[in-house]
Amino acid sequence: MKTRIAINGFGRIGRNLFRLLLNHPSIEVIVINDIADKKTMAHLVKYDSIHGVLPSTVSDDEKGILVDGKHFLFFHEKSISNLDWKSLDIDYVVESTGKHKTFEELNAHIIAGAKKVILSAPSEVDTIKTVVLGVNDSILDGTETIISNASCTTNNAAPMIKVINELCGIEQAYITTIHSYTTDQSLHDQPHKDLRRARGASQSIVPTTTGAAKALTKIFPEFDGKIGGCGIRVPVPDGSLTDITFNVKRAVTINEINAAFKIAAETNLKGILDYTEDPIVSVDVIGNKNSCIFDAQLTSVIDKMVKVVGWYDNEIGYSSRIIDLILLTKK
């Protein structure tokens, strides 16, 4: 019997997750909830400016949307309390609105009848476990009803931190995410609480903050106070990278670092960490389901200072980890 899920919030992550789950052998989407109208959302499922045209027939009716004749319910509820997940026998709700991050808000899905909730963002509270697959998923014991899948950048950076720490130990780290623009920004100048993000997304390189540094200390509590970071938004719609500079405990060579990443990509982090020695650019990682594509050409070392770079499709890579987290926790 397939695992039944609901997607609450049908933006970039919600729609990419939906596309990835079409024809999945063990997970099926039952219902979508979003305040936008069904006709528009059906169109955006079919036609995606980044990931292309879905090779399926997509339409809508009075109760939902259809893909190749398969029907998916579509609700328009603003309040989680108005959703009846129990009557639909929902196993998982993927909370991807970007609005609900507290325990009380997320637990409303459990009260509504869902068995588990996956949050597609870092949690704002310590009572919800934040997980990066391949790095700290051993903290899960099966009793959790709400789990945070962290952020796309956290999923990208954490495998690199893991490999470097196991290789030579870490004293401090600073991450810089060179990130594609997102729907949090506007095409033209618009008011925003972050005055840099108030500027047109397609016109400038935009220095900003990143929540990944804080989230990473939930993944690696031993590095609390030792990881900093910032974000640089750039005028591309998808495809990002994280540049991490480490102060390490012992001197290490470029060859040692690259060899460690190559081994990890082929063994314990396979499917999460990819490895390349090719001179790639951001467009080359679009569609890659790995959390991190390690760029061996960009590794550099000065004594005990190490710099590594990992690319990521901040949409598809992250959405793929949500699926993997469901598969892991439904066992």
Regions found by a protein language model. Name each.
Residues A150-S151, I205-P207, N247, Y312:
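Hydrophobic alpha-helical scaffolding
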